[in-house]
């Protein structure tokens, strides 16, 4: 998987982010010098976790023949500060008709989403500069 970010204008921090054939606008709030034309990068991290969790649950439920219409995943992301680790508060709002065993199984499945696993695991960075 590959993603690229390129600045769109000379005002603010608005960037067009490309992933495959998809484009998303990412920016910073006006209070941080941006133009607030899109989510900021940290919000995109929360978006990635919320959407990955929802899709993982829905894929599993579909294979099982379970109806999860109305499923909603809310993620609140608190960046690390001195002495406090990064925190993700993830709330899975599931349809009331699901049984207790189904809900417990879906909670286990939710933690298996690729973004969740990436955030839980070790991450290595290979950083370099290329002159253009």
Feature-to-residue mapping (PLM):
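Extended beta-strand/beta-hairpin segments
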Residues: 1-47, 55-132
